[in-house]
Amino acid sequence: MQNKTAKFLLSLTFSISAFFPIEAAEIFNGRKVSAIHPAGANGSKILKMEETILSKSIKPETAYFYWQSENNLIMIKNGQSFSVDLASGKAVPTENNDKQNSIVPPEAENIKWSNNNSIAYTIGQNLYFSDSKNNRKLVAKGDSNISFGQSVSRNEFGISDGIFWSPDNSLIAFYRKDESLVTDFPLIDITTRTGSLKNLKYPMNGMDSEKTDLGIYTIADSSVIYIKVDDFEYDRYLTNISWSPDSRFILIQILDRSQKHLRLNMYRATDGSFVKTLLTEDNDKYVEPLDPVYFLKNSWQFIYRTANRDGYRNLYLCDTTGKVRRLTTTNADVRYIGNDGTNVYYTSAEISPVESHLFSISIKKAKGGKASFAEFSKIGTPVRHTFEPGWHNITFSPDYKYFIDSYSSFNLPFKAILKSCGNKFEKVITESYCPLSDYATGEVEIGTVPSADGKYSNWYRLLKPKDFDPAKKYPVILYVYGGPHSQLVKNTWLGNIRLWEMYMAQRGYIVYVQDNRGTENRGLEYEQAIHKQCGQVEMADQLVGIEMLKSLPYVDSTRIGVHGWSYGGFMTISLMTNFPEIFKVGVAGGPVIDWKWYEIMYGERYMETEATNADGFRRTSLMKKVNDLKGKLLICQGAVDNTVLWQHSLNFVQECIRQQVQLDYFPYPIAEHNVYGKDRVHLMNKVTLYFDDNL
């Protein structure tokens, strides 16, 4: 509501952090910890709303790293390109002279480069191929219902691409998406003189979905064949495409419409025929594939990631004969980073749920050479490569001799270090300054509260005003998201805090943020707790945090507000209507109102359909809760929202009219799901003033 080449590009987002020293153990053991920004003693400048959204001087910088070759590391920072010397770690400005861009048409989208500088891309619904001499060919021509080379399934299941080059650069696999049966939802463009209709293909829960196929284009003869997929009839998802090392086979993770059954199948690239099923997954709640398989260097063994086998997203070593052996054995979610044929690198939350660190595990024999499956269980002890507290993002060189460790922590805004894989070499490339050192910022506290069922510790952060006085009573704003694939509290700069939270604390509010069951990085049971009952366990967990706040002598329990967007908007209205005695004011943005109006892929995973989960849809529908709204509620939404349709909030408003329930409503006529630029300044001013006037 949410791939590896030599030119792997990593976006590094710098966060905000305090410099007050905190011991790592305090973060890890779940104790309540707090820090005061250095500006808390000296800073006097006051944040302005425009600054929190538009100003670059107080915002995290963004840098990008990619390896042009094994010995050529490029850093792009503030629009300037730098070449990084591997021996010294020094960055020297360079000319940004990318000749490859000259063969990319300006209207091209979904651009994918091969290793020999050919490209495949889309223009509109059509798929094209161009070689390095700019000889362009039309691969497949689409129309208003059919597109080629685009991402499918609304970017669920880890899908972000629609074009897949073979390792030998001779073949292009691509998605064909047919939306002929998908219902059109009307969006109105008011910027034209008489208004324009723009229909959106939106596969709504329980209705007809898009149909996907996978084609393969052979460059040598310009021929196209399609993979012959017979699994789960035609109502299924083709996810996470992978090529075999020799480019002869293609692997597809095929998921049925109910999302409870998955098959990893192998097909021949020459004619699309089925070869074999390598493995299967079944779960009575859902299976969610998020990664393609990753072949080991110079091997037919591959890495497969799933949470379905042991309860956490762990890595498994597999081969094309169907053998599967668990590779990582931690009770924490891990993410695959890469392999050099003898070591597999991954990041893991095993140190702490709010930390991400780099590890490796050996996949070679003790005396050298590759391990067989029989030997594998006897070898490989995880080795940790990052030790500084924080959230680490990793970019490896193509030969896996070096990696960039870019990270921030509660104490550190940002740091990027060039390291050798043997931990024998380390050079700091760049380190961020604190852009808020002149501003009046308050105390930030990070800690845990138990989940409502008592099984887990849920992390929170609490921001207090700069001039906090424990003898006073303060209003509280709960900022909430709470949905899948989110984690708002991390050991990043000031715990992942947002500038708007600082702005509100500056105005005299305590701002509270908490992760709950259903969010990511805590294992499958934690994540699946929301299945068929979205909003229910999330509210229960959030209320534990609210009760903790109410027990504090400086919290005014009669002045508690809540704000969230998207899933957070759904949570905001859910909390306002289920617990009107607690929440006085709410601001909901782009809220889901009834899951029957949400899209198939995400919605059916977590809520199934009305036919299979009628009670769940009834209990979670906010249309049934209108008469329970007692406090002040403002709903904001983009009128051309293509994620949560405008239909949601408009139906809620209409039901309020029918039941004579008052609320406040503000649409953003040309905004989609999120509101950007100066429009966002207007939005956040409106949100702020709504709390000022009513809380």
Give the predicted meaning of each segment.
Residues 37, 69, 74-79, 85, ...:
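Beta-strand C-termini and the immediately following turn/loop, strongest in propeller blades
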Residues 42, 49, 138-163, 174-226, ...:
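Predominantly five- to eight-bladed beta-propeller fold
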Residues 44-54, 97-102, 136-155, 205, ...:
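Surface-exposed loop and turn segments in beta-propeller and other repeat-based domains
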Residues 59-65, 108, 151-168, 238-242, ...:
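Signature of short aromatic-glycine-proline-rich micro-motifs recurring in repeat-based ectodomains
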Residues 61-66, 70-81, 91-95, 99-105, ...:
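Non-catalytic accessory segments flanking enzyme active sites
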Residues 86-89, 131-134, 218-222, 269-272, ...:
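Short loop/turn segments that connect beta-strands within beta-propeller blades
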Residues 177-185, 190-324:
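Beta-propeller domains
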Residues 184, 247, 393-695:
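Serine-hydrolase catalytic core recognition
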